[in-house]
């Protein structure tokens, strides 16, 4: 029975292009997971979009003398193009400035407010001393009063995990201009997190399958749980849906509150765009559905504490949660099943910094290198369980010594020889024990790699796939069919047949990681149809007449299945080309020089 799998991907912020450190944390792992489950025949809904509200976008707009909407429009397109070129197979990649998102966000706010889970409190708001604008909590840094860490943020300390307010910090300073923020009394709306403390604690304690850092960080956060502000004094954001704010433009819903709601609103938009307005309920109100959230470690508590609290408070209520007389009447929205958090990626030993030039944007990278080469590196050497460093030397080494030399070499030597000598899948003779052993080992990879992917252990899964490819290379080197063919044509045909079967099975195993090259290999092997593409953009017109673009794909047409090869004898091959490019080591110095030029 196919499972319903929600793949909820962190929303990239639309105040600039995204760099490779961003997609290492949220994009590539989520796509690997989604592609695997589609190959398994499960019903996958992968959603996200650009996060387009808040002060950072207004700061960029002010600097350029334009509007926040213009900035959001620009970077929504740039980011969408980058994710398309990287092959991230969203069912819907949308944005938070749609009428649909506003409606869902306001419904959740209103429902929580009516149920007493949103309360009013007077507090000290942080404002920039130079611009007078509200400073987001994450734009304020200072010393943690509990552990002394001097780069604690205005919302939490990443060193000790404590929940903080900007006023808690010692010597707070603005990340915008380095000046101390100005604190002014102001009334805000707060999400009453302590009201959910016991439920959250019991629920998180039961999540034994979570990564230890996610579970421990979340439990630690619960120790000092307090109401969290969900509005800010600014003009750019989702309006507060209360009558007294109908004609006010000075206070909006805080960006973090509306961003996490985006997973739900994007699912609802997908259903509307597909002509099945209630189809989203199959994922959100189906007790058997499983929700997987992907993000960097700096967003853990938003997905393990704050968003679950909002879901618990909303339940099956409101305009969207209720399904009167329907299949899911009275069934609450589902909580996360797993929260897959990645660590941080650095670059040449330094923290990514756009302002300091220590960065390589996705679009810049893909203008010179293949997407699968980047996907390979970010998986095999990425920050899955610990902070890792991207260096150009390591990227070139991994590409040449692993991707090209192992998997690329196996495909090239097998297909080029078979195409030259047979032109189609050859008729094998009797299989020897050695033949059967290598076939069995690669076939077993469907299970072993699949188990690792299902557990979100992407690095180990890719390493196992590469080990299997290496075993087939060893088999060919020992059997030497290029020599055997001179004296025993049938035996050579058998060896190449076994190798082709292994390559065909490995093609499926590598597809979640390397979709572009896997699709080309699929075609070289003589197959038709898609196992990994294409993606597409679609223009959507809302009821208010506004249009926006979504990244999506017709994944129901994909023909690949997570099964061993059934490559038929006699299938005509297409002329193969090498799957991957070997990189000249001179690119290391060229790229380091580019980085140095950005540093000035």
From Swiss-Prot:
Highest taxon listed in the record's lineage: Bacteria
Gene3D superfamilies, sorted: HUPs (3.40.50.620), Isoleucyl-tRNA Synthetase, Domain 1 (1.10.730.10), Methionyl-tRNA synthetase, Zn-domain (2.20.28.20)
Sequence motif: 'KMSKS' region, positions: 351-355
SUPFAM superfamilies: Anticodon-binding domain of a subclass of class I aminoacyl-tRNA synthetases, Methionyl-tRNA synthetase (MetRS), Zn-domain, Nucleotidylyl transferase
E.C. number: 6.1.1.10
Keyword Aminoacyl-tRNA synthetase: yes
Localization (cell): Cytoplasm
Binding, Zn(2+): 144, 147, 157, 160
InterPro entries attached to this UniProt entry: Anticodon_Met, Met-tRNA_ligase_1, Met-tRNA_synth, Methionyl/Leucyl_tRNA_Synth, MetRS_core, MetRS_Zn, Rossmann-like_a/b/a_fold, tRNAsynth_Ia_anticodon-bd
Motif ('HIGH' region): 12-22
Keywords from the named record: Aminoacyl-tRNA synthetase, ATP-binding, Cytoplasm, Ligase, Metal-binding, Nucleotide-binding, Protein biosynthesis, Zinc
Main location group: cytoplasm
Catalytic reactions on record: tRNA(Met) + L-methionine + ATP = L-methionyl-tRNA(Met) + AMP + diphosphate
Presence of keyword Aminoacyl-tRNA synthetase: yes
Cofactor(s) essential for the protein: Zn(2+)
An example Gene Ontology molecular-function term: methionine-tRNA ligase activity
GO biological process terms, semicolon-separated: methionyl-tRNA aminoacylation
Binding note for cofactor: Binds 1 zinc ion per subunit.
Record-listed ATP binding positions: 354
Coiled-coil region list: none
GO CC list: cytosol
Family in the record: Belongs to the class-I aminoacyl-tRNA synthetase family. MetG type 1 subfamily.
HAMAP family the record matches: Met_tRNA_synth_type1 (MF_00098)
Role noted for this protein: Is required not only for elongation of protein synthesis but also for the initiation of all mRNA translation through initiator tRNA(fMet) aminoacylation.
Protein name: Methionine--tRNA ligase
Natural source organism: Chloroflexus aggregans (strain MD-66 / DSM 9485)
